[in-house]
């Protein structure tokens, strides 16, 4: 039987273990290990510098930039030990940029305020006033010097609006008018009395000629101007039947050739001439 080959002990130790590991620490006992900084890995000097050369260069550049800005490194950038966190350094760089942008905005706003004259107040928002700037009292009703028109608004019983205008006399006729005529009242002006009576007649409430109602959503007039309420006007327009004596428009269930229930006259259809 052939003996198994004995491993060569003269093989270099760096081929048996990676170069980044510390062979002394691996061969020593746990009791001989030195205390290390928490969160940091012990790496041999041979592997530390090639891996972190660029990071150390960037750190030195950032520290020089902070010193040029006149800011203390103790306030802006904490003192970094042998092991530093690149993420924390990037966050601090963002904070510095944010502070610089805020300072620039503050300076621009202060510069804009200085450009305005010191005595110029800020323009308030324009708002339309609800009342007149110089309100004046209206003319009295019995003022003899009033010239113009007076409008009188009244609501009819059928909820319609009626406007009655009253015009003042011209200046020429007013100057020729004697004081006695002005004091005489309505008796001295028969024309005014007639106009007043015509206005009072117009103020009388409308009444349906068929059902005698005074309230309806819509008034409908017949061909001769006779006022009819909405319901009676629709029936009269549809069937064309009414009493020739009292203008009673029968309901739908009342047949023609019947007598009027109000005056007894026959309800014949109206023949258009």
UniProtKB/Swiss-Prot annotation:
GO cellular component: nucleoplasm; nucleus
Superkingdom of the organism of origin: Eukaryota
Region annotation (Disordered) ranges: 99-143, 172-201
Any one of the GO BP annotations: positive regulation of transcription by RNA polymerase II
Annotated zinc fingers (GATA-type), start-end: 208-232
SUPFAM superfamilies linked to this entry: Glucocorticoid receptor-like (DNA-binding domain) (SSF57716)
Cystine pairs: none
GO molecular function: DNA-binding transcription factor activity, RNA polymerase II-specific; sequence-specific DNA binding; zinc ion binding
Chief subcellular location: nucleus
Subcellular location: Nucleus
Keywords from the UniProt entry: Activator, Developmental protein, Differentiation, DNA-binding, Metal-binding, Nucleus, Oogenesis, Repressor, Spermatogenesis, Transcription, Transcription regulation, Zinc, Zinc-finger
One protein family per Pfam: GATA
Function: Transcriptional regulator that plays a key role in germ cell development. Determines the oogenic fate by activating key genes for the oogenic program and meiotic prophase entry. Acts downstream of bone morphogenetic protein (BMP) by regulating expression of genes required for the oogenic programs, which are repressed by Polycomb activities in sexually uncommitted germ cells. Regulates expression of STRA8, a central downstream effector for the meiotic program. Acts independently of retinoic acid (RA).
Name used for this protein in its record: GATA-type zinc finger protein 1
Species of origin: Homo sapiens (Human)
């Amino acid at each position: 039987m052939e003996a198994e080959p004995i491993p060569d002990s003269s093989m270099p130790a760096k081929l048996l273990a990676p170069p980044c590991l510390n062979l002394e620490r691996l061969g020593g006992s746990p009791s001989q290990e030195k205390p290390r900084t928490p969160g940091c890995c012990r790496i041999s000097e041979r592997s530390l510098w090639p891996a972190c050369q660029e990071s150390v260069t960037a750190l030195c550049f950032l520290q020089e930039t902070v010193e040029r800005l006149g800011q203390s490194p103790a306030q802006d950038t904490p003192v970094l030990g042998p092991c530093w966190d690149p993420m924390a350094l990037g966050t601090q760089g963002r904070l510095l940029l944010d502070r610089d942008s805020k300072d620039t905005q503050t300076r621009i706003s202060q510069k804009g305020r200085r450009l305005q004259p010191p005595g110029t107040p800020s323009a308030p928002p324009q708002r339309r006033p609800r009342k007149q700037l110089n309100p004046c009292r209206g003319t009295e009703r019995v003022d003899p010097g009033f010239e113009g028109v007076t409008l009188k608004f009244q609501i009819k019983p059928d909820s319609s609006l009626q406007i009655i205008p009253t015009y003042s006399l011209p200046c020429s006729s007013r100057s020729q008018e004697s004081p006695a005529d002005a004091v005489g009242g309505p008796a001295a002006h028969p024309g005014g009395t007639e106009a007043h009576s015509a206005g009072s007649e117009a103020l009388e409430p409308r009444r349906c000629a068929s059902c005698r109602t005074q309230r309806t959503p819509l008034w409908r007039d017949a061909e001769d101007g006779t006022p009819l309420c909405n319901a009676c006007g629709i029936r009269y327009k549809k069937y064309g039947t009414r009493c020739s004596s009292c203008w009673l428009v029968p309901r739908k269930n009342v047949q023609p050739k019947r007598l009027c229930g109000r005056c007894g006259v026959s309800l014949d259809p109206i023949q258009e001439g």
